[in-house]
């Protein structure tokens, strides 16, 4: 395979993990970061100890503080940043791009102010003439396990399946299997909304409830995700795949999951401000819960679990009381509530 340069915007755990994969595949990953300390550590020590402790990076992984340097000559630009920074970074990217480039994003969330998915935010901020294609790379994955080269599967979703296949070819190897899909909306809805349900799974575990409760929460949570997804144009089958149920399972059941850990602390009685301070990293489900709360009402979509989690986060609702209210809802036929 011909060696290709790939720029990665974001020096966090996911951006760094993907850079490791690209280096393993004999490509030239260049990470753009905004902190001297992290950029220097990647270049000099070949580690990123804050985000991926104990991982030694291939020497081919490089980092820079210069966006122009990172994207110069890159076949693909991967955007691996928190959703709250997406607009700002994409404005910078739009100014810096000199020719049409394949853009890939791995950020999972909804913009609260607009209810826009991340690909829609990118499309607003990066001129169409500078976007050769826009691909969503998503699925059941923790950066820590990708960096350890544990078996992982993802899905590259794009309306242009040829572009999705290019991304597939750059990242696929014996440790990371990539599928392709043309349902961008479904991939983004599944990836974003599962973070809300993962908060709920953590809350359930923090309250001391068992596997029964979490299994029910995940299953009924997926019903809510599917209802909203179909309402905005997703293929319902997408939610049975990697970017749907796959991503939900890994995020609701793993100690690597920031959303599960945050929910677990909430379930044990800590308030949201305390939890976010202790986490020290972005918890996307909190921001997404705020967005989906208003979005579901606007679309008249029934999402009782999501609404309960919103109430716990932002209205100081007692978690046990929220569970009691969910369990006491009007009886239904299961098939009618999907």
Curated annotation (Swiss-Prot):
List UniProt keywords, sorted A-Z: Cytoplasm, Lipid biosynthesis, Lipid metabolism, NAD, NADP, Nucleotide-binding, Oxidoreductase, Phospholipid biosynthesis, Phospholipid metabolism
Q: Catalytic center at which residues?
A: 194
Query: What InterPro entries has UniProt attached to this entry?
Result: 6-PGluconate_DH-like_C_sf, 6PGD_dom2, G3P_DH_NAD-dep, G3P_DH_NAD-dep_C, G3P_DH_NAD-dep_N, NAD(P)-bd_dom_sf
Tell me the GO molecular function terms: glycerol-3-phosphate dehydrogenase [NAD(P)+] activity; NAD binding
Q: One of this protein's GO BP terms?
A: glycerol-3-phosphate catabolic process
Q: What EC number is given for this enzyme?
A: 1.1.1.94
Family in the record: Belongs to the NAD-dependent glycerol-3-phosphate dehydrogenase family.
- What is the protein's given name? Glycerol-3-phosphate dehydrogenase [NAD(P)+]
Q: Which organism is it from?
A: Listeria innocua serovar 6a (strain ATCC BAA-680 / CLIP 11262)
């Amino acid at each position: 395979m011909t060696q290709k340069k790939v720029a990665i915007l974001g020096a966090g755990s996911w951006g760094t993990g993907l850079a490791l994969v690209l280096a393993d595949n004999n490509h030239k990953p260049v990470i753009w970061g905004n902190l001297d300390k992290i950029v220097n550590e990647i270049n000099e020590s070949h580690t990123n100890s804050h985000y991926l402790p104990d991982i030694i990076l291939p020497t081919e992984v490089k980092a820079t503080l210069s966006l122009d340097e990172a994207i110069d000559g890159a076949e693909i630009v991967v955007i691996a940043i928190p959703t709250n920074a997406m607009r700002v970074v994409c404005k910078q990217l739009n100014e810096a791009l000199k020719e049409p480039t394949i853009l890939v994003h791995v950020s999972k969330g909804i913009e609260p102010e607009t209810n826009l998915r991340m690909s829609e935010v990118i499309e607003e901020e990066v001129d169409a003439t500078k976007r050769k294609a826009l691909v969503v790379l998503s699925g059941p994955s923790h950066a820590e396990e990708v960096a350890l080269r544990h078996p992982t599967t993802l899905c590259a979703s794009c309306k242009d399946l040829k572009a999705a296949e290019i991304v597939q070819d750059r990242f696929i190897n014996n440790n990371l299997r990539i599928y392709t899909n043309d349902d961008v909306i479904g991939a983004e809805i599944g990836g974003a909304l599962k973070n809300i349900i993962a908060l709920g799974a953590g809350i359930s575990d923090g309250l001391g409830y068992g596997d029964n409760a979490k299994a029910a929460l995940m299953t009924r949570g997926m019903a809510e995700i599917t209802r909203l997804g179909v309402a905005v144009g997703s293929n319902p089958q997408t939610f049975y795949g990697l970017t749907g149920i796959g991503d939900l399972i890994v995020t609701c059941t793993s100690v690597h999951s920031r959303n599960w850990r945050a929910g677990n602390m909430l379930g044990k009685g800590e308030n949201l401000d305390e939890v976010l301070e202790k986490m020290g990293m972005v918890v996307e489900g909190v921001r997404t819960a705020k967005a989906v709360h208003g979005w579901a009402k606007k679309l008249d979509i029934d999402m009782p679990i999501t609404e309960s989690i919103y109430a716990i986060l932002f209205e100081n609702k007692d978690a046990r009381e929220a569970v009691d209210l969910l369990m006491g809802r009007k009886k239904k036929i299961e098939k009618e509530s999907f």
